[in-house]
């Protein structure tokens, strides 16, 4: 997967107006894909072979937009170790006004993991997805056994073997295993992410929302304005589902007849409130499974400051950001000291 960018936005030319309470609302405007309301039923032989139960409650597609941004839970390292657990299981999620039944980490929006260079990440990964009902095809490169899983620390400079960041490991439903990833002392600080990387099931699981951010702290520590800024994590995803409001077949991910839209942290076009003079650091994670995303702030400008932890020599001002799957972006947003109306 490709890697991403970071942005630093200022209010020079943002065209924002302060409210009576002195709050500035910065709306994240991501164009949605209106590709039809009926979802694809998938391919013969694979349709809902991994469903845990029938009778999922269906709800009409009623877009819900312009709600305050919801951010993931934060889990931090202690004394050089970030020790946590992640559970893979189906869960109901209300996304963009539609109730979906999807594979997930921790039953919804996956936690953000924060650690420092030289520290160790320890995860007990539990697979509580239902048993697979299909067999391995003659060509194992075809999608199969969609409830097998593993975990990948995307972008980390670490060991790919043993119980570290080993994408060749496979965990069948009903099992658990330990992951231990040690970062070197000189590891690049910045925004990373984690996701399944099991060949045959990764796309379906990522499309279901099994993605989370990892922050390796210390980036821009020598720039006080950035170091003091409030961090906000934004996971960019493509929401797609079939007629059962699920993702149960590889074919659901690609046909133009599938219902799909874009989301940030499981929300359609969320809104961020900023006080006059406030600075925020936005960490954007391109965790979509397929398409590039064109991101912009409504009437705002953005300034690129780093690419996947690699700091640029100077800010690069822009109005739009194209993020490919796997890319990450840090974004600093400024608001000026405007007078209340």
Where are these regions (language model features)?
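N-terminal secretory signal peptides
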Residues: 1-19, 26-33
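Short, cationic motifs built from Arg/Lys/His that form the positively charged side of catalytic pockets
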Residues: 20-21, 283-286, 340
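Cleavable N-terminal signal peptides
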Residues: 29, 39-40
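Histidine-centered copper-binding motifs that mark active-site loops
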Residues: 43-334
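Residue-level detector of conserved catalytic or cofactor/ligand-binding positions
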Residues: 333-341
């Amino acid at each position: 997967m490709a890697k991403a960018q970071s942005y630093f936005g200022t209010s020079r030319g943002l065209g924002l107006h302060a409210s009576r309470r002195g709050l500035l609302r910065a709306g994240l405007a991501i164009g949605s894909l209106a590709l039809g309301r009926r979802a694809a039923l998938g391919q013969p032989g694979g349709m809902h072979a991994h469903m845990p139960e029938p009778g999922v409650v269906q709800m009409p597609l009623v877009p819900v937009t312009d709600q305050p941004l919801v951010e993931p839970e934060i889990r931090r390292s202690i004394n050089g170790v970030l020790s946590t657990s992640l559970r893979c299981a189906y869960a109901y999620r209300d996304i963009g006004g539609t109730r979906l039944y999807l594979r997930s980490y921790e039953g919804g929006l996956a936690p953000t993991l924060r650690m420092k260079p030289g520290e160790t990440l320890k995860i007990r990964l539990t697979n509580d997805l239902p048993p697979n009902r299909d067999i391995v095809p003659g060509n194992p490169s075809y999608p199969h056994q969609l409830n097998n899983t593993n975990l990948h620390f995307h972008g980390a400079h670490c060991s790919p073997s043993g119980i570290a960041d080993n994408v060749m490991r496979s965990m069948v439903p009903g099992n658990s295993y330990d992951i231990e990833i040690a970062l070197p002392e000189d590891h690049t600080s910045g925004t990373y992410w984690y996701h399944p990387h099991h060949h045959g099931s990764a796309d379906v699981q990522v499309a279901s929302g099994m993605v989370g951010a990892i922050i390796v702290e210390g980036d821009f520590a020598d720039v006080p304005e950035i170091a003091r800024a409030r961090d906000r994590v934004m996971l960019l995803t493509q929401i797609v589902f079939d007629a059962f409001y699920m993702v149960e077949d590889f074919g659901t991910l690609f046909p133009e007849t599938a219902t799909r839209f874009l989301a940030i942290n499981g929300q359609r076009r969320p809104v961020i409130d900023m006080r006059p003079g406030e600075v925020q650091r936005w960490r954007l994670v391109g965790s979509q499974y397929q398409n590039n995303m064109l991101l912009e702030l409504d009437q705002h400008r953005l300034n690129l400051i780093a690419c996947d932890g690699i700091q640029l020599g100077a800010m690069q001002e822009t109005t739009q950001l194209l993020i490919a799957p796997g890319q990450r972006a840090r974004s600093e947003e400024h608001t000026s000291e405007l007078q209340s109306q």
